[in-house]
Design a protein with these regions (language model features):
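Rieske [2Fe-2S] iron-sulfur-binding domain
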Residues: 2-18, 28-153
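Short, positively charged
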Residues: 18-22, 273-275
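Soluble or luminal CAZymes and related metallo-dependent hydrolases
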Residues: 21, 111, 291, 295
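A short, structural micro-pattern
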Residues: 23, 113, 120-122, 255, ...
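Short, solvent-exposed secondary-structure boundary motifs
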Residues: 25-43, 103-115, 183-191, 220-227, ...
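A broad, low-specificity signal marking well-ordered, structured residues that form hydrophobic/aromatic
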Residues: 26-27, 40, 49, 117, ...
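C-terminal catalytic domain of Rieske-type non-heme iron oxygenases
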Residues: 134-345
Length: 345
C-alpha cells in the first residue's frame, strides 16, 4: 500500500488548511454491503476514490490508474484485483499492480501501485482517513448498542444533501425545530417549548441529555407513551461530522441513530445512517428505511437553503437563543480543532 502526505485536489472547494484538518479524520464513504464485485466510486473532500474488496480486504484509493490516468471505476473486478479497462493492468489487495498483460513475466515498475488510504469497516460502513498517521491514528466514532445482544443492526441507504456537512450536523443536534419541521413524522406542533439542557465537553466533542415530552412514535401511529412519560434523547457528538442519538422509549426500548455526514465537497454531503434498536424487530427494515428518510427529508430544505452555506464559528456573526446550546457547543468544538472563524463559506 502506498501512502503519502496528501494535498488538496486542484479543484478543491475547501480552504487548504481546513481540508487537511478534515483529511486527518475518519469519514464514511460507502456501506459495507455495497462493496462486493464491481469497483465502487465515491468522493470525499473533493478527492475521487475507488473502493473494492479483494480477499476479504477493503481498499480505498485514488480513482486513477498510475499508468495513464484512467479512472479505475471504469474497470472491473477479478479474483486477484481490479482491472484497468485501458491496458488491463490489475491491482490487488495491497494496491500494487500484480499483472501487466502486455509484458508477462517482466518486472513490474515500483510506481505501478495505487495511492491508497487507511480503511476501517465498522457499523456496516466503510470509513477512510485521507491523512492518517499510522503511528497515531485518530479514534473512530463510536455507536452505542451496535454490538449489544438483542439489538437489530440496520443500515439505511445513503443519500445526498446539497449543503455543507456542518450545517446538516448542526440541524441533527438541534432540538428546537421539532415542532416546526417534523410534524408529519413524530413531533407535536403544539409542543414548542424546549426544556433546559447542558452539553458536556468530552475528548471527542460533547454529549447532551435532553429530556422532554416530545415523543418519537410516528405521527400516524396509534401507540402512545404512558401519561407524563419523559423522553430522553442522548446525543454524542464526535467531531467533526458524526453524531449519535440514543432515544429512550418506554419499557426500556432503545433506538440509536448515527448521523454520519460525509463531506463530498464543501457544498455536497453524503449521508449515512446506521440504526440499532431492541424493539419492533418484526417490522420490515424497508419500513425503517422509509421512515428514517422521511425524517431526513423534512430537514432537507432548511439545510440546502441556509445562508451562508458554511458554518460561522465566530459566535458574534449570528444571533443565538437559549435552545442553541448544542449548536454553540458544536461550533466551539470545531473552533477548538483549529477550523477558521467562517468555516467553509
Amino acid at each position: 500500500m502506498k501512502t503519502t502526505t496528501p494535498t488538496p485536489p486542484a479543484h478543491c472547494t475547501f480552504d487548504p488548511e481546513d481540508w487537511l484538518r478534515l483529511a486527518r479524520c475518519w469519514h464514511p464513504v460507502a456501506r459495507a454491503c455495497d462493496i462486493d464485485g464491481a469497483p465502487v466510486k465515491a468522493t470525499l473532500l473533493d478527492e475521487q476514490l475507488v473502493i473494492y474488496r479483494i480477499k476479504g480486504q477493503v481498499v480505498v484509493a485514488r480513482d486513477v490508474c498510475p499508468h495513464r490516468g484512467v479512472p479505475l471505476t471504469l474497470g472491473f473486478h477479478e479474483e486477484e484485483g481490479i482491472v484497468c479497462p485501458y491496458h488491463g493492468l490489475r491491482f490487488g489487495e495491497d494496491g500494487r499492480c500484480n499483472r501487466i498483460p502486455s509484458s508477462p513475466g517482466q518486472p513490474i515498475p515500483a510506481k505501478l501501485h495505487l495511492t491508497s488510504f487507511a480503511v476501517e469497516e465498522r457499523y456496516g460502513l466503510i470509513w477512510t482517513c485521507l491523512a492518517c498517521d499510522p503511528d497515531n491514528p485518530p479514534p473512530l466514532p463510536t455507536m452505542p448498542h451496535w454490538d449489544d445482544a438483542g439489538f437489530q443492526q440496520i443500515n439505511c441507504p445513503a443519500f445526498e444533501v446539497k449543503g455543507f456537512a456542518g450545517r446538516q450536523v448542526e440541524g441533527f443536534l438541534d432540538v428546537a425545530h421539532f415542532a416546526w419541521i417534523h410534524t408529519d413524522t413524530f413531533a407535536d406542533p403544539d409542543n414548542q417549548q424546549v426544556p433546559d439542557y447542558t452539553p458536556q465537553e468530552t475528548p471527542f466533542g460533547f454529549v447532551a441529555d435532553y429530556w422532554s415530552s416530545v415523543g418519537n412514535y410516528p405521527a400516524s401511529s396509534d401507540f402512545r407513551a404512558p401519561e407524563g412519560f419523559q423522553w430522553l434523547r442522548h446525543f454524542e457528538m464526535h467531531l467533526p461530522f458524526t453524531a449519535t442519538l440514543t432515544i429512550h422509549f418506554p419499557a426500556d426500548a432503545r433506538l440509536v441513530i448515527m448521523n454520519a455526514a460525509s463531506p463530498v465537497s464543501s457544498r455536497v454531503t453524503r449521508m449515512f445512517a446506521p440504526i440499532a434498536r431492541n424493539f419492533d424487530l418484526h417490522v420490515p427494515v424497508e419500513d425503517v428505511h422509509a421512515f428514517n428518510l422521511r425524517v431526513f427529508e423534512e430537514d432537507r430544505l432548511m439545510v440546502e437553503t441556509q445562508r451562508p452555506g458554511g458554518l460561522p464559528l465566530d459566535l458574534t456573526l449570528e444571533a443565538h437563543i437559549p435552545a442553541d446550546r448544542s449548536s454553540i457547543a458544536y461550533r466551539r468544538g470545531l473552533k477548538k480543532m483549529g477550523f477558521g472563524d467562517f468555516f467553509l463559506v
